[in-house]
Amino acid sequence: MVAIIEQNLEKVQKLCQEYHVLRLELIGSALSERKFNDKKSDIDFLIEFQPLEEGKYADTYFGLLEGLESIFNRHVDLVMIKAVKNRYFLEAINKNRKLLYAA
């Protein structure tokens, strides 16, 4: 896991509490210092929310996204695990993921 994640983990966990996150996992290049370009790489997260009232998902999703981008000062991708339908992509995710927060 890259240093920028470790240095901001407490902020990320507080944000997860604020935005009703059930699980947040790190995926992609930020898992490895070797693959992560500190100037160019975005940060990819796998996300699952707690049950929310209808109509709250968009505000919650985009609020969390903006918060994470503000913390890291870079582009963030949020991938909702329930939205992943491609089995090859899912297999790749399952091989390399790191739990950062669980409610």
Across the structure, where does each feature detected by a protein language model lie?
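Catalytic core of pol beta-like nucleotidyltransferases
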Residues: M1-E25, S29-D38, Q50-A103
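The conserved glycine-aromatic submotif of the RRM
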Residues: S41
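Short, aliphatic-rich beta-strand segments
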Residues: D44-E48
